[in-house]
Amino acid sequence: MARTEGDSWDLANSVGATATMVAAARAAATRRSRPIIADPFAEPLVRAVGLDLFTRAASGEVDLDEVAAGLGFARMVDTFAARALFFDKFFADAIAAGLRQVVIVASGLDARPYRLPWPTGMRVYEIDQPEVIEFKTTTLARLGASPTADHHPVGIDLRDDWPSALRAAGFDAARPTAWLAEGVLIGFLPPEAETRLLDNVIELSAVGSRLAADYGTINGSSAESQQLAQQMTEGWRAHGLDMDIAGLTYPGEHTDVAAYLRSHGWETATADHGDVVLAAGLAELTAADRQSPASTIGFVTAVRSTD
């Protein structure tokens, strides 16, 4: 089903199911003999969502890489583990630079407010659909998990007036902020909503603020991309999952986030999928690996150095 303005979802359906898939990949990565990330909350969160394939993948009963490779997505676990590590390092660098305010947009099943070793005085805000925020905070509370920072979840759709909701939750725009947009600017918002999101981030960012994001689209307009999207949709359906890749993303030209930030005076550094995998200490991507949807995604870290 195609996306519509104002549509909603939970973690078992539509865009929400992709967040559960990513968490299952983090759980699988955590189980490896030499893991590059440790996310002890990924498996119980996936289990609580209740999608059978991802539950079994998170627990190690099913090889998620094997399943995904059959759908045209090579090295899925490496992809999402390396992405998580890339953004974890972004936060470590922000902390070292003295930043003590974080905003995670479209946080999904991201458990960074609980799993990262935040310093004293760190305020962490996370924004997502109200149902997603409620599910995650309730599930983690039942597990006995406590945030490792001063945690402020904000339940609101990014297509709504989230800046006002963020301020109402205590966000201080006068303080430098580390912003994370992981897995959201890759086609899951309409192009105009992407630039609106970035404009809001820029407006709310004091000098010294930082942003990290992945960007592009997982569903290109070429015949090859459309064929791969159809292959993945049919494959997920065969596993009992309704994840129509073409239907989950918005058509149109999506935002070059790095270029947009540079045009607004931010200093940027970019990387591609292969760079991020190599930086994580994993094997270099082969030509076949580069045919996966992740190969089209770029990464940026940026700093606002002037008004």
Curated annotation (Swiss-Prot):
Gene Ontology annotations of biological process type: methylation
Protein's UniProt keywords contain S-adenosyl-L-methionine: yes
Residues at which S-adenosyl-L-methionine binds: 128, 157-158
Top EC class of this enzyme: transferase
EC number(s) stated in the UniProt entry for this protein: 2.1.1.-
Family: Belongs to the UPF0677 family.
Protein name (Swiss-Prot/TrEMBL): Putative S-adenosyl-L-methionine-dependent methyltransferase MMAR_4570
Keyword annotations: Methyltransferase, S-adenosyl-L-methionine, Transferase
Record's function text: Exhibits S-adenosyl-L-methionine-dependent methyltransferase activity.
A Gene Ontology molecular function term of the record: methyltransferase activity
NCBIfam families, alphabetized: mthyl_TIGR00027
Species for this entry: Mycobacterium marinum (strain ATCC BAA-535 / M)
